[in-house]
Amino acid sequence: MNAIGIAGSGLDVNRQWLNAISDNIANMNDATPTSGPAFQARYVEAEAGAGTSGVFVKATVLGDSTGIVESDPTSPLADANGNVRMPNIDLGDQMGQLIMAQRAYEANAKVVTDAQTTYQAALAIGKNN
């Protein structure tokens, strides 16, 4: 696999990672009844492929469904005690993950750009001879 293919596989993994993080952040304030499960955060596990085959998503793991029981008597989903179940998602952790995923995406995109520039320069050398 060439540099563009390897970086492309990294871009795909980063895209899935960013999607999971954005989904987690978007749903972190979703209340559910205490009788049901809380929103489960998604975590992407990546693994290097054999040799130079790039990287791939090994698994998407779901977080804890028990969540955190909080008092919110004004919620239409509250139980008789005024409690709802909230996802156990740490915004600080998700923002840290978001920054790492964004930087990894940018690094892979730069590899693609630099490889294209290098390939174009190599083709230009061949044309001049």
Regions found by a protein language model. Give the residues of each.
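Amphipathic alpha-helical polymerization modules
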Residues: 1-129
